[in-house]
Curated annotation (Swiss-Prot):
The gene is NFYB7. Its main location: nucleus. SUPFAM superfamilies: Histone-fold. This is Nuclear transcription factor Y subunit B-7. InterPro entries: CBFA_NFYB_domain (IPR003958), Histone-fold (IPR009072), Transc_fact_NFYB/HAP3 (IPR027113), Transcrpt_fac_NFYB/HAP3_CS (IPR003956). Residues 136-151 have a biased composition (Low complexity). Belongs to the NFYB/HAP3 subunit family. The lineage of its organism: Eukaryota, Viridiplantae, Streptophyta, Embryophyta, Tracheophyta. One of its GO terms (molecular function) is DNA-binding transcription activator activity, RNA polymerase II-specific. It is found in: Nucleus. Coiled coil: none annotated. It comes from Arabidopsis thaliana (Mouse-ear cress). Residues 1-40, 130-151 are annotated as: Disordered. Expressed in flowers and green siliques.
Length: 215
């Protein structure tokens, strides 16, 4: 009898085993980590928020930052998804602050609702001032321009009125001389007699009138 020699399995020639320590494996791990990090908040921002509640000499390890980073990101996704469902039911495309507060209340975080409402009101007031500030400045400029224009119009009208008054005065003085002006200033230089000459020409008539009054 001939013994059959067992066939040696040398593996499939088309399949290559990957070594965990190879450069390609490290590249794949880095790509996966980058994709995972894209879903999270920036770890620098998370670290700054965490340091605000620590003493000045307090320190935070890297794994603590990464843990909080993942938890916060998942929480944000959770709340945003609930608010998004509400907007879809109401056929709206934009999630607003009221939707976020509604989602937090629905998910059972009632203790956070009151401070979030206070923050939302302050935020809206601040943003409203930023938006309205250019409009208010533009309105002030328009009001100043209107006031300046009205002032110029008033000065022009006042000057025009003064010119009209001067014209009327000169016209009256030229065509209607004042009776209180001296004889030398009367505008009739071509007249050949004066009040004195009239008295000289009619002295007798004047005396007769006086005698008739006495008698």
């Amino acid at each position: 009898m001939t013994e059959e020699s067992p066939e040696e399995d040398h593996g499939s020639p088309g399949v290559a085993e990957t070594n965990p320590g190879s450069p390609s494996s490290k590249t794949n791990n880095n790509n996966n980590n980058n994709k995972e990090q894209d879903r999270f908040l920036p770890i620098a921002n998370v670290g700054r928020i965490m340091k605000k509640v620590l003493p000045g000499n307090g320190k935070i390890s890297k794994d603590a930052k990464e843990t909080v980073q993942e938890c916060v990101s998942e929480f944000i996704s959770f709340v945003t998804g609930e608010a998004s469902d509400k907007c879809q039911r109401e056929k709206r495309k934009t999630i607003n602050g009221d939707d976020i507060i509604w989602a937090i209340t629905t998910l059972g975080f009632e203790d956070y609702v009151a401070p979030l409402k206070v923050y939302l009101c302050k935020y809206r007031d601040t943003e409203g001032e930023k938006v309205n500030s250019p409009k208010q400045q533009q309105q002030r400029q328009q009001q100043q321009q209107i006031q300046q224009q009205n002032h110029h119009n008033y000065q022009f009208q006042e000057q025009d009125q003064n010119n009209n008054n001067m014209s009327c005065t000169s016209y009256i003085s030229h065509h209607h001389p004042s009776p209180f002006l001296p004889v030398d200033h009367q505008p009739f230089p071509n007249i050949a007699f004066s009040p004195k000459s009239l008295q000289k020409q009619f002295p007798q008539q004047h005396d007769n009138n006086i005698d008739s009054i006495h008698w």
